[in-house]
Amino acid sequence: MENSGLLFNNDETIINKKIKKIIYENQYDKPLFYDIDLRKNNKKLIYLLDWFCVVVLLVIGSILLLKVPVRGRLFRLNDESISYPKLEEIIPLGLLIPLVTAVPFAMILLISIIFKRDINDFHHSLLGFLQSISVTILLTGSFKVFIGGLRPSFLEFCKPTKESIVAGNPPVGYGAIYYDRSICTESEFIVNDGLSAYPSGHSSIAASCFGFLALYLLARLKCFDNRGHIIIYLLIIGCLITAGLIGISRVADYRHTFLNVLAGWSIGLLISLSCYRLNFSSLFGRDNHISIHSHWLTYWDYHNNNNNSNSNNNNNNNNNNNNNNNNNNNNNNNKKDNINNNSTKTQNNFESYQSPNGIPLNELQN
């Protein structure tokens, strides 16, 4: 792993410590579908699947946001909370998308490629960033379609007239004071936008993108590593402030209530945290700059070395067993030789013995 001053020198030591925490004692302790060789043998296929999922999520989320009608809400014509003027947007969608994508991409490119020169870090950072955007858009679109909500300036989006009120569906509810979208005169797209207050899409996307960038900078620059560089702190906190200001701007131009914005922030920040952790070893630990690619490379080496060590131990044990067997055979042969020698000596001694009258015993036997 290359080191450009933004990384620690003991990256492999950190990874090895984490590896020991995920060594499972037996197969019953392992998670479902846990196979260390699966990712090793299908690295490219798994990454292609990740990118494919990003594209699919972006397409589905965009369709939900732009094409699918939201759940209709009933409203009163004399409701002051939806009668605010429709002001010009402080940050329109055409400015939001380049802002939340270009700035994080430029920072990731600058640090991972220019400074670190680590293509794997760039790949995982970019993949995690796009995963964060795609999941956020999908969730935001789903909430808007199934829950929705009236914008503070909804009546400006609807623009009912006396003729449209008469031609639309009759009012319902106690006192017959609640109307539906059938009395609106604006286009279906604009009315649909006016009913899409919850949650704030600007807030969720901004929090997701700049929240991920804040985690990325925190991991690479190590803001709280006892160095006290205020510029690093300002870079990181600036990401969160930018996301906050984008959300507040939606309250200022009467597009959302503060609760809508708060819901968007919550979705975006939670998704950015989870997607960053999905691609890196931790969120706030000393190893939060280490990608899962580096983690798995070290884990595979550890596993291979462990298997080789076990194989060598087995071979040594077999050799020791063979040596022990040979030693046992030699001992048995030595015992047999000793027995034969003793029997020969006994026979010789017997032949040399004499009877009490001086006649050798062998002659007496004859």
UniProtKB/Swiss-Prot annotation:
GO-annotated cellular components: membrane
SUPFAM superfamilies registered for this protein in UniProt: Acid phosphatase/Vanadium-dependent haloperoxidase (SSF48317)
Broad class of the protein's primary localization: membrane
Listed Low complexity bias regions: 308-349
Alphabetical keyword list: Membrane, Transmembrane, Transmembrane helix
Record Gene3D superfamilies: Phosphatidic acid phosphatase type 2/haloperoxidase
Location of the region described as Disordered in the Swiss-Prot/TrEMBL record: 308-366
Membrane topology: Multi-pass membrane protein
Composition bias, Polar residues: 350-366
GO MF assignments: phosphatidate phosphatase activity
Family indicated by similarity: Belongs to the PA-phosphatase related phosphoesterase family.
Protein name in UniProt: PA-phosphatase related-family protein DDB_G0271516
